[in-house]
């Protein structure tokens, strides 16, 4: 599953307020609740699932990228939210650099292959310096989504 298949403009947060990975996860999950991708009553359970995964090993993979993710039986399709932080978020990343782009995604429980495929596609796209630069320079969620669509075709 490609990034453009997961995101809408409403699921892009161009100015994350978070200062650490836990706040970033909360903010992105709150976005998914606000956009109707997660039921309000499931919010805490989804946060717990993502934080459990994040506690086992940071998803700050370097190059200013964080990809918090989890599997849960509370959703029926892959959902996600992308956040951008201009100042950077402490994610305890592998390279000790702050995360500027955080892509949170959730996969339905039991869909291991889809989980791996989605994670690989997101990581591959975000590792492209030109793509990260386009997202960082974009002036709005619309412009960020345009960049996602453009680079996703390449």
Where are these regions (language model features)?
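Cytosolic covalent-transfer regions centered on His/Cys nucleophiles
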Residues: 1-154
